[in-house]
Amino acid sequence: QNHAGWLNFLKIRASYGEVGNQSGIDRYDGTQFYKFESQSGAYIGPNKGTIIDTNGKIASLGREWERIKNYNLGLDFSLFNSRLTGTAEVYMKRNDNMLINVSYPGVLGDNAGMSNNGKFRSHGWEVMVNWSDKIGKDFTYHIGGTYSFNTNKLTDIGAVSVLKSGFVDKQQGYPLNSIFGLRYAGKAQTEEERQKYLYRFLTGNTIGLTEQNFRLGDNMYADVNNDGKLDQNDIVYLGTDDPKISFSFNVGAEWKGFDLSLVFQGAAQRTIFRTGDNNGNEIWRIPMKALYLNTSNQSVGNTWSPENRGAYYPTYSNKNEINDYNYQASSWSVEDGSYIRLKNVELGYTLPQR
C-alpha cells in the first residue's frame, strides 16, 4: 500500500466447503410396506379372497445424504481513495452422489425410490463493481453493477441418454432444465416444395407429419442425422430454461437534499418453451388454437398466405393434429428469454435538520 497510493485495499480469498442435502429421502424409505386388498369374484369360505401387495414403492437401504462440494476463489479490492470498490469470484460445485429417480423396466411392477446415481457439475464467475464520487460541494453520485455467468451439466444419471422432445428437467450430458426439439427448416412455400418434403419424410416419421394435415405454409424440419427419416434421432439440444447470464446495474445521485436512484436488472442466454393446456401457457405458443379462446395478438397479420409468404406463423388452425405438428418443440417454437428491465426508481427529498 505504501508503494501504490491508488490501492487502498486488496484481499485474495479461497474457500472449500461441503454441504449435505436429504431432499428425496423419506423417513421410512428403508422399510418395505405391504397392504391387504380384498378381491372381487369367488368367495373363499365366508369371505372373498384377500391378497397381500406392496404399497407401490420398493424399499431402499442404500440411499444417503448428498455431499455437495463447493470451491470458491475471490478477490476484493478498493481503489482511488475507495471511490472504486468491487469483488470478483470464480466458483465450482460438484455433486458425485446426487439423488435422482432411476428408471427400471415396467415389468418390475413398483416404483423405485431415489438413488445416489447422479453426478452433477456447476461452475461460473461473478463480478461486482461500484464507483462513487463527488462533484463540487453539493453533488454526489454513484454507479455500479453486477454480472454473473453460470453453467452446469448433469454428467451421469446412471441411465441410457436418450433425448426426448420438450422440457426435460434432468438429461444426462446436458444442463438441468434443458429443452430439446427439432431443427426448423423453413416453411413449405409452394406445392412442389410440399410434395417433395412429403415424399422424403412421410414414411416412417414419428413427428406427426401426415399428408392430409400438412398444408402450404406449414413448418418443415431438418433431417439432422441424414438417415432419410424424421424421428427422435433428429432431436437436438435447444437451450436451457435457466439463464446462464444475470446482470444488474444501478445509478444514483444526491443534490441539496434531493436523491434519485435507478436499478436495472436482466438475464440472458435463457431459452423458453411454453407448455401447458388451453388454460395455461399454450395459448401464448399456439395462437387461435380453439374457438372463443383468449389468445395474444402478436400473430395478427403475421400468418402465412400466398400473399404473405414471409410471415412468421403458419395459417391459423384449431385442429389439434396440425397445431401439434407445427408448434412442437423446435428451434422455431422456442423463444429467447433474454430481457432487461427497469426494476426500481426512487426519487426523494430529505428535509433539512433544524
Residue spans for each PLM region:
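Residues on the lipid-exposed face of transmembrane beta-strands in outer-membrane beta-barrel proteins
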Residues: 1, 14, 73-77, 88, ...
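Solvent-exposed loop/turn elements at secondary-structure boundaries
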Residues: 2-67, 85, 89-120, 158-164, ...
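Outer-envelope beta-barrel architecture signal
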Residues: 6-10, 82-84, 137-143, 245-247, ...
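Conserved small-residue
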Residues: 26-28, 36, 115, 132-239, ...
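Outer-membrane beta-barrel signature, preferentially recognizing the C-terminal barrel domain
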Residues: 40-85, 113-136, 173-190, 240-245
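Extracytoplasmic gating/loop element in the C-terminal half of outer-membrane beta-barrel translocons
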Residues: 267-354
